[in-house]
């Protein structure tokens, strides 16, 4: 999530939380945000985010970690996870990976980033808010 605009800039759907899945998402985010500006990456302290592969993939970024057992440090993404479940996924009986992928894609790419307003973004969508800057 690009915190300033509350925009999901990269995501990966997997049935496990392996380091390779996390690295794939980081690589997507890097490709999306091709910039030389200093970047801060925030995560919690689970194994995937403290591994050597993670450190290598994010070596040019400033690392920021949540305190152990304190999800409020990562409240924006925790809120997003709650929203996608409550507003969208809980409405469906997901039958397989392909169906789940389509649902997540629809929510993020055709609603959350493009239509859903956020008070933080002056009641604009993340895409519209980001265009201002």
What is the predicted function of each stretch?
Residues 1-133:
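Charged DNA-binding/catalytic regions of mobile-element recombinases
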């Amino acid at each position: 999530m690009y915190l300033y605009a509350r925009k999901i800039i990269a995501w990966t759907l997997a049935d496990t939380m392996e380091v390779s899945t996390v690295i794939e998402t980081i690589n997507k985010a890097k490709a999306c945000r091709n910039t030389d500006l200093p970047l801060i990456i925030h995560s919690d302290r689970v194994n995937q985010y403290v591994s050597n592969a993670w450190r290598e993939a994010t070596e040019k970024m400033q690392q920021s970690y949540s305190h152990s057992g304190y999800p409020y440090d990562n409240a924006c993404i925790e809120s997003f996870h709650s929203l996608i479940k409550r507003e969208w996924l809980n409405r469906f009986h997901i039958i397989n990976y392909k169906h789940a992928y389509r649902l997540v894609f629809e929510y993020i790419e055709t609603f959350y980033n493009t239509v859903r307003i956020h008070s933080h973004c002056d009641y604009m969508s993340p895409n519209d808010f980001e265009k201002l800057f």
